[in-house]
Amino acid sequence: RYRSGEINAVECLSQECAALGDVVPGVLETFVGQCDLDAFFPPFVAFCERHKIPVTILSDGLDFYVESLLKKHGLERLPWFANHAKFVSDDGVTKLKPSFPYRSEHCEQCGNCKRNHMLASSADDDTLIYVGDGISDRCAVRYADVVFAKADLIRYCQSQNISFHEFRDFRDVKARMERILQQGRLTPRREARMARRDAFIAE
């Protein structure tokens, strides 16, 4: 229902958390501990840090597992933004309750508006690189100068005539970035710069 647009991210996460019923925090933490990042993400971060390229993680998921995954790989130093979740007790039943501190009234689909984070943290002369794969990335990519896309985001970029580099994992992103830097082609995209300018004017 979320992928079809019938419900948005706030409704989807709220329904998913409610469906968990009585939650045992330790069991949930064990499950999260079994999950992992793209194996090529830590080397990609190291590459970016060597080249003085800041990395920020934007997730429309929940903070407790984002934080867990970053700590698992020693990447908790990275700035990141996600929806919040906490355990609450209700008549002896422990439930996972989500909240959405970064929701935007201008964004109907997402719980964590990635577009707003991009605009708030960038300067006029910055060149923005965006890596994404899903529905929550759609509102952000038009503001990015360099876009890496896979899965659902490829189809969206194609439908909106947004240029992009296709990738399978962060090994592909790193390899492409190496070529872009070697060739001196890390330059602003005119349409993205105009979109950012229009957004700032509208604010």
Task: Set out the residue ranges of the language-model regions.
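Short, acidic/turn-prone active-site loops that include or flank metal/cofactor-
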Residues: 82-87, 152-156, 169-173
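Alpha-helical substrate-recognition element adjacent to the catalytic core
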Residues: 1-84
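Acidic, Mg2+-coordinating phosphoryl-transfer loop and its flanking beta/alpha structural elements
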Residues: 59-60, 124-166
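Anion (oxyanion) recognition and catalysis
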Residues: 49, 71-74, 122, 142, ...
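P-loop/Walker A phosphate-binding loop and immediately adjacent motor/lid segment at beta-alpha junctions
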Residues: 101-116, 158-191
